Amino acid sequence: MARKWNLPFLLLPLVLGIPLVRGSNPLPLVVNTWPFKNATEAAWWTLVSGGSALDAVEKGCAMCEKEQCGGTVGFGGSPDEVGETTLDAMIMDGTAMDVGAVGGLRRIKNAIGVARKVLEHTTHTLLVGDSATKFAVSMGFTSEDLSTNTSRALHSDWLSRNCQPNYWRNVIPDPSKYCGPYKPPDFLEQNNRAHKEVDIHSHDTIGMVVIHKTGHTAAGTSTNGLKFKIPGRVGDSPIPGAGAYADDMAGAAAATGDGDTLLRFLPSYQAVEYMRGGDDPARACQKVISRIQKYYPKFFGAVICANVTGSYGAACNRLPTFTQFSFMVYNSLHNQAIEEKVDCM
């Protein structure tokens, strides 16, 4: 799926001295993963109120953190093996190629806000764990418990099911039958990589891309990660080029899904590079999915892409339980946030 506008055609009336018809330019543009409408609207109204592309991404993702979108963004969701909720987020400025990100952030609700502070007040790209929390507190954020009755109940139920599912392999006791603690066996058998069936509702990261009316780009993500992950695990979301990527010379992209798989292919960076090479956004997204399918045909994932002329698209990998991917779009041709769907390939 794609919506395309030909830039030379848009510029022709200006060359001839003819004013453009109001609303004929699709910019600005907001696209985000999943039907998180309030996040889309928060980003859009930030833009029309005079905010930058970076401001829009931050406000949009922050709305999802506040609303706990799908239980997979923000506090109170996706407890790890010990029952704690931690957060990952990143934000990227495609004009300056600056990035701020946090991974395994504890006790701070506004992860995307902390990522913005990393971008603005340090020369680093990524801060993690307890030290990221200390940084956040120094920046004025409040330290508070991220667990809720809902996340505690999820963890309790998981323990009652012998810690299933989990993400261990080649350890004893058998992780498919028992809880840990685990340790490596004396002799490691070399067997084929096992594929774990995934719950698609445990991966609904918000990824957002914004193209400002000036052509400036930004992208970002926010997530509470994988349910019942091994403590310390960080997925694709806070990694530039994996979770999201933006470059004013081409466009922006964001990914959602099985972060451990996506991280190995830098799908957002690859999508932007495909657009730089001339592919329209829909085709760029499709090529990214095809590239991963060659190695992981059963992976769960989707990508959104937008170029600097206002064209956008998306693609996803088809599974028995995942045949369509929903994403949100708001541009100057719409008077509201629109949910669009693409058939998986």
Swiss-Prot record:
The disulfides recorded in the entry are: C64-C69, C163-C179, C285-C305, C316-C344
- Function statement: Cleaves the GlcNAc-Asn bond which joins oligosaccharides to the peptide of asparagine-linked glycoproteins.
- Give the EC number(s) under which this enzyme is classified: 3.5.1.26
Q: Which gene encodes it?
A: Aga
Which residues have a glycan attached per UniProt?
N38, N149, N307
Q: What class of enzyme is it?
A: hydrolase
Give the UniProt keywords, A-Z: Autocatalytic cleavage, Disulfide bond, Glycoprotein, Hydrolase, Lysosome, Protease, Signal
Superkingdom of the organism of origin: Eukaryota
Q: Which catalysed reactions does the entry list for this protein?
A: N(4)-(beta-N-acetyl-D-glucosaminyl)-L-asparagine + H2O = N-acetyl-beta-D-glucosaminylamine + L-aspartate + H(+)
Any GO BP annotation: proteolysis
Where does it reside?
A: Lysosome
Q: Which organism is it from?
A: Rattus norvegicus (Rat)
Subunit annotation:
Heterotetramer of two alpha and two beta chains arranged as a dimer of alpha/beta heterodimers.
**Cellular component, GO, one term:** lysosome
**Organism lineage:** Eukaryota, Metazoa, Chordata, Craniata, Vertebrata
The record's family statement is: Belongs to the Ntn-hydrolase family.
Residues at which substrate binds: R233, V234, G235, D236, T256, G257, D258, G259
Q: What is this protein called?
A: N(4)-(Beta-N-acetylglucosaminyl)-L-asparaginase
Q: Which residues form the active site?
A: T205 (nucleophile)
- Signal peptide residues on this chain, from the entry's feature table: 1-23
